[in-house]
Amino acid sequence: VYKGKQKYFNSYRLYVNASSLLVMFFALDFPICKKSSQEYYLPGWLKVAPLWQKRLFLASIFGAELTTPRPKLSKKGNFYAPVFSMNKREKFLNNGIRFLEEVSLMCKEFGIEATDLLTRKKYYTKSGDVSWHMELIFSCKPKSLINLWAKIGFIYNNRKSYLANLAVHYLSFKREVI
């Protein structure tokens, strides 16, 4: 229940019983198991990788974790700022902040601005640990939105990808007209 209203969300999992996939993730320096309860950073190889590889990485995590493009109803023609969020246990809060800062720096290479990084206590877990919610908020300036949704976009999420394409076409048309 959130603000007096019952909210329902869909959640999907993929279960793969292949040790080879686990070995590959380990070799690529990706987190294994619960991401909220461990330290991890952007892999070193990714920081020096070509832009196309960085784009694929960002598009895949944005497909899962970046908010869906949606217009502001109060200000016609504008969009809400995209938000990339993650949760971390209190012990790993600084690691989460650093990870989001690394994502922000990688996005700058594509001409995408991040405007804020917010943290707030979310809840206490069953074991009594405090979980923190962190949000990397991107600029809602048209140029930054076009760069985010056109240059990076969303992989593995057809709905977000479709809405992002519509938004890019609208913003590009609006820019030409005005």
Which residues does each PLM region occupy?
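Internal intein/HINT superfamily modules and their associated LAGLIDADG
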Residues: V1-I178
